Every structure is written in C-alpha cells, then in structure tokens.
Amino acid sequence: MRVGLLFGGCSGEHEVSIKSAQAIAKALASDDNQTKYQVSPFYIQKNGVWLGPDVSQQVLDQGVPWGDQPVTAGQRWQFPPEAARMEVWFPILHGPNGEDGTVQGLFSLMQVPYVGSGVLGSCVGMDKLAMKMVFERAGLPQVNYMGVERGEIWSNPCVFPALCEKIEAQVGYPCFVKPANLGSSVGIAKVRNRSELEAALDNAASYDRRIIVEAGLTDIREVECAVLGNENPQASVVGEITYDSDFYDYETKYTDGRSQMHIPANLPKAVVNQIQTMAIQAFKAVDAAGLGRLDFFYQPTTGQIVINEINTLPGFTAFSMYPELWRASGVEFPSLVDRLLQLALDYHGRPGHQ
C-alpha cells in the first residue's frame, strides 16, 4: 500500500514535525511494515510549497528545514505528481494548517483516507475555546476560564482596563493567557498581577484573534493519557510530566533535560481509572479518531482531576509522550504506526467519515 508521509508545514512547530516524520519513517521501514507499506515523503516548506519525495527524503535525512524561496500564490496550488498515487496519508503536521482541519479537509475533498481525526474533530481539538465549550457540554470538569477577542485588547484603549477588571473578577490570579489556536505552549504566559496580564494579553493577541484566559491551580501534577481507536477507543497507561520551570512552556518542552516523563505515573489506581475514563469521554466528545493525547491536572490534596486539553495530532518523535505511553502499554512504535494506518483505512474509508 502506498503511504504519503506529510510533514513540515507553515506553523511554528515545523521543526518538531520533521522530527516526528523521521521517527515514523523509521517505524515504517521495520521488517513487518516494509512488507505492507511503500512510503513516499512529502515536505511542505514554511512558505506553503509542497516538495516531492526526492527532496523530501533529503529533508528527512538531514533533519533540518529546506530553504524557502519567494513564491507566488499559484505555486501553492501545485502538488507533486506523486501525491495523486498515494492510497493513504499519514499527516504529521503540528499546529495551524496541519492539525486544525485544514489539511484534513483537503484529504477529505480528495476522498483519500488519512491518519487522525476528521475535519470537525481536528478543528475542535485545535481551538481551545471551542474545545472547552465541548468539554463543558460533556460534563468534564475544567478550570475556570473566559474567552477574549483581539479587538477587545487592541481596538479601544478605553475598553482594555475594563477587560482586565473583568478577568480579575471572573478568573483571578494567578492565571494563564493563551492564544486559542496554537500548540506547543507558544505564546502562553503565566500572570500574577495587572501589569503581567496586560503584557500577556498583548502578546497573545499578536498570535491569534481569539485568546483564552484560564485560572491557575496550585500544588498540581500534570498527567497525560494516550487514546487509540475510532468508535471504540482504548486508553493507555497514565504518564506524568515534571519540570523545574514555572510552567510547561515551549523552552521547557523542547530543551533536553528541562522536563522529565514518568511512565507509568505513580498514582492511586482509582485516579488512573478515572483519568482513563475521562480521556475516552473527551476523545469522543470532540469527535476525534485514530489518536489523541489527553492532558489533565491532578490535585492530590483535594483529589480533584480536571481536563486541560486534547491534542489530536501529538508529537510523534521516538521519545514523545504519546508513543512512550503506548510502549508502556505493550504497543511498540512500529506496531503503533501500523495500527494508526489501519484505523485510517477503517474510519476515513467509510461513507460519512470523510
């Protein structure tokens, strides 16, 4: 079966996508997978231009982005001719224009199966405000939050102080300010007072027109659970992230030695069971498919578990949390990649799931 491995993309998570694609390509080259799949890599430059398998393989081999050249709008409509021959796609594009329903819409339009959630699940999984509304409707406990529009921050200086007062009254300090549609903790800030709030809102507005402000919790443990499947998804063991920084920001995530994964997490069995149940509930609530990583906060002093977010296309390097959780659950990396491709054929190959 001909598999298109799509990576790179126009988001700030371009380099992470390359690393994920390298790991997936290696897994597809395993003895068992080589007999099933013929892989062709396709790299999307930061300027949005698709490159064919020959150059894309060079990017995989070198592990660094391909140099961009000035392009016209018409060049972004040109796809490598080899793309038309792919029977199933494995998109590993992180962030905007990759896991937000855009490329999923393209594949759906072309009526070709692909790994991961469909357009709806991807959209809801990317937009933190929409996601929280869906979680709320599903009865999943969350931290207190409120949504903010860029226009409330930039358009009228007289409105801005009133907005800050509203946030202080409804959410309070400490709180986190986040762009609604970015991943990997890009643009996120922890704030403790009015001056930090003003700066964080201004910064978040430079990334997105929709911003979310969430209440901060104290004495929490950050735990994660991986989900695999379509209509009858399974939950992995639960893992925990620890770090020395103030919060789990971009630098902490992607700097060696700044954070540690503990798999499985040292948690009471009842807590693990509850997290796994909530993970599957959240996965279904957003209409996810194939894979998803669910992030939670656990407060040992109160026993409270609240859902933070779902990532419908999580990092997929050899040492990323998602594959590591499944490895600890008895599913090795090559088998995981194989199962995801089979789930794609099962889900997106049927009517009503495009």
Swiss-Prot record:
GO cellular component, one term: cytosol
Any Pfam family: Dala_Dala_lig_N
Cellular compartment(s): Cytoplasm
Superkingdom of this protein's organism: Bacteria
Annotated signal sequence range: none
Gene Ontology molecular functions: ATP binding; D-alanine-D-alanine ligase activity; metal ion binding
List of residues binding Mg(2+) 2: E309, N311
Main location: cytoplasm
ATP-grasp domain mapped to chain residues: 132-342
EC number, as in UniProt: 6.3.2.4
Cofactor note: Binds 2 magnesium or manganese ions per subunit.
Binding site for ATP: 168-223
One of the GO biological process terms: peptidoglycan biosynthetic process
Pathway of action: Cell wall biogenesis; peptidoglycan biosynthesis
Family: Belongs to the D-alanine--D-alanine ligase family.
Function: Cell wall formation.
Protein name: D-alanine--D-alanine ligase
Lineage: Bacteria, Bacillati, Cyanobacteriota, Cyanophyceae, Synechococcales
